[in-house]
């Protein structure tokens, strides 16, 4: 499970949720993930994330494995992560759709023309020339760039000393089962021991809110992907623990029962990235604390309205905010602690919950970072209350819905 937080204060609270899970027989490995963009906004380094993770493990007396993820890294920024991280999410989105060398394309087509039947799937995968050409022109350059990035990390860090994930989710269209099969086969052929793959799914995975789309279609795609992974592992020598990774995975409550049911059906693993919404739980806790902490939470919102375009433009593909549905300054200025928390907390049964308010605050962590020591002071002064929000959110609203809901 991708955890961690932008302000590096909630690791122990998150581990508390995982310790509750462990007592119920649910084994979850925490992965602290933070991207290069987030480090630049927060003026932090990968070493800061490593320090925070190690400190949280000591504080919580965590006895299991844990990792620090260089999240969404490329060849341009990977070097700063190599010393501190032992999990690397290779982001090759910029290479998807770029053309590989013609000789590589023709070789890919020639070696993949045999029919492929995946047990559990009604139809064989499409391996006609047109299908293979489309796959090669769309993904082959990205696959080769992932292999180059992996090799660069291995040459510096050493073989077997880190976990590799490949991200293919930041594209317009979902991969077909055939796409995923040949992506994984090609990664294996190039010697990339991929342990997690993040494909694109149909529908919108907006930041910090529920899934928007056809749940039945998602279920079909998720199940087909699990079947493909199972077969590729048998054929290719990729790690037996190769799993699907769900990015922007927090708060997708309508999908969690589907995911849980299918990973149990196929005895499969799952990597769910949730770290981005931890700061919203911090903000909820500060609102509930009242006084100056509540006033700071309100001021962060007021500033976010003034800087709407600046804050939302980097996330335009993963948010959907109707500015007309955002509560006006005059209204929020008069809110009590409970009113602010009710509007922010992701509780769809609460009529006060405002999905637009939540999404805007999700991308407004830059403003909290500008408060710097003042924001951290309020977090530490209200550590127990804030930590309670973080632990309950991760366990009650995420882990339980995936792993304990049998429906």
PLM region spans:
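Conserved, mostly hydrophobic/aromatic
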Residues: 71, 166, 247
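Short, conserved phosphate-binding/catalytic loop or strand-edge motifs used
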Residues: 160-164
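Short, well-ordered beta-to-alpha junction loops that form the rim of enzyme active sites
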Residues: 168-170
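A generic local structural motif
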Residues: 54-55, 166
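Hydrophobic "anchor" residues on beta-strands that sit immediately upstream
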Residues: 67, 165, 243
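Aromatic- and acidic-residue-enriched carbohydrate-binding clefts of CAZyme catalytic domains
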Residues: 103-134, 200-202
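Active-site capping/gating regions of soluble enzymes
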Residues: 1-38, 44-52, 58-60, 76-84, ...
């Amino acid at each position: 499970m991708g955890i961690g937080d932008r302000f590096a204060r909630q690791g122990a609270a998150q581990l508390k949720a995982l310790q509750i899970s462990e007592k119920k027989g649910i084994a979850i490995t925490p992965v602290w993930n933070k991207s290069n963009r987030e480090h630049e906004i927060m003026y932090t380094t990968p070493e800061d994330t490593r320090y925070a993770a190690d400190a949280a493990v000591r504080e919580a007396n965590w006895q299991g494995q844990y990792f620090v993820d260089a999240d969404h890294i490329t060849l341009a920024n990977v070097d700063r992560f190599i010393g501190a991280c032992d999990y690397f999410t290779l982001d090759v989105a910029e290479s998807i759709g770029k053309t590989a060398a013609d000789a590589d394309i023709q070789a890919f087509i020639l070696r993949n023309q045999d029919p492929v039947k995946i047990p559990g799937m009604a139809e064989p995968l499409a391996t006609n020339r047109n299908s293979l050409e489309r796959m090669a022109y769309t993904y082959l350059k990205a696959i080769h760039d992932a292999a180059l990035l992996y090799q660069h990390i291995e040459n510096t860090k050493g073989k077997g000393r880190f976990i590799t994930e490949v991200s293919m989710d930041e594209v317009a269209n979902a991969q077909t089962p055939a796409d995923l099969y040949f992506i994984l086969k090609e990664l294996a052929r190039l010697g990339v021991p991929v342990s997690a793959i993040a494909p694109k799914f149909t529908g919108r995975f907006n930041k910090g809110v529920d899934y928007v789309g056809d749940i039945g279609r998602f279920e079909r795609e998720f199940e087909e992907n699990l079947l493909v992974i199972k077969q590729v592992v048998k054929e290719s020598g990729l790690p037996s623990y190769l799993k699907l990774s769900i990015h922007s995975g927090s708060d997708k409550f309508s999908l969690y029962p589907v995911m849980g049911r299918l990973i149990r059906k196929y005895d499969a693993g799952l990597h769910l990235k949730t770290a981005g919404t931890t700061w919203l739980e911090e903000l909820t806790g500060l609102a509930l604390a009242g006084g100056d902490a509540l006033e700071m939470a309100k001021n962060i919102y007021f500033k976010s309205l003034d800087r709407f375009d600046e804050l939302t433009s980097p996330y335009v593909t993963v948010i959907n905010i109707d500015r007309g549905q955002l509560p006006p300054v005059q209204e929020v200025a008069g809110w009590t602690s409970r009113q602010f928390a009710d509007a922010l907390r992701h509780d769809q049964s609460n009529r006060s919950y405002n999905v637009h308010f939540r999404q805007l605050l999700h991308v407004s962590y830059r403003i909290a970072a500008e408060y710097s020591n003042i924001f951290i002071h309020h977090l530490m002064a209200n550590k127990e209350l804030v930590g309670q929000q973080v632990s309950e959110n991760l366990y009650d609203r995420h882990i339980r819905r995936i792993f304990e809901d049998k429906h």
